[in-house]
Amino acid sequence: VKSTNLMAFVATKMLERQEDLDTCTEMQVEKMKASTKARLRTESSFAPRTWEDAIKDGELLFNGTILQAESPTMTLASVEMKGKKSPIDFAPSNIAPIGQNPIYLSPCIPNFDGNVWEATMYHHRGATLTKTMNCNCFQRTIWCHPNPSRMRLSYAFVLYCRNTKKICGYLIARQVAGIETGIRKCFRCIKSGFVMATDEISLTILRSIKSGAQLDPYWGNETPDIDKTEAYMLSLREAGP
């Protein structure tokens, strides 16, 4: 009952900030809300209460606090059993992630030099993401560049850290079945619940495969270091995706 009340409270509050959620996270919260209502109906035989009552009880239970995950693998329910609490704050940068979305709280590494050998690789279906720095921005800037070696088979997306204006990742998206799921899973490895900001070319391509994106004003007044980007992409292509 306590878990159900908490989930009702969290789902309701997160959906009140719907404009701060990307499409994938919004769908997860909606599913969370639907499953919580189903649990509420099941519990009605021994703990009858309305949805509104569950929301109020969930808020009162923690005295205006919300559980916050300690690691990417912990869900809201698993943290609840540990009894951890933190002040409730539904500002855009503090919405608690759902499921296994990572939480990033530390700042970006200031002395990143673009070296590839410390990169972290993520593979999901037709998408391969190379994360090259501990970039903890909640919103990424992407520059799309067709992969010359596989022009008709894939697209390459270079991700920039909005704090340092340096490369923070590199995504290869092949045109295969299920690529939307693959891209979403890759993005969820490095961000938490926010819309992907892109340039105009990337926006068109991402929307063509139904991945949530929005234009970024950064591209209207600044230009990335194209030479460094080209050299970086070339080194990745030579090393293989």
Swiss-Prot record:
Primary localization: host cell
Keyword Transcription regulation: no
Alphabetized InterPro entries for the sequence: Flu_C_NS1, Flu_C_NS2
Keyword DNA-binding attached: no
Gene Ontology cellular-component terms listed: host cell cytoplasm; host cell nucleus
Function: Suppresses the RNA silencing-based antiviral response in Drosophila cells.
Protein name, as recorded: Non-structural protein 1
Protein encoded by which gene: NS
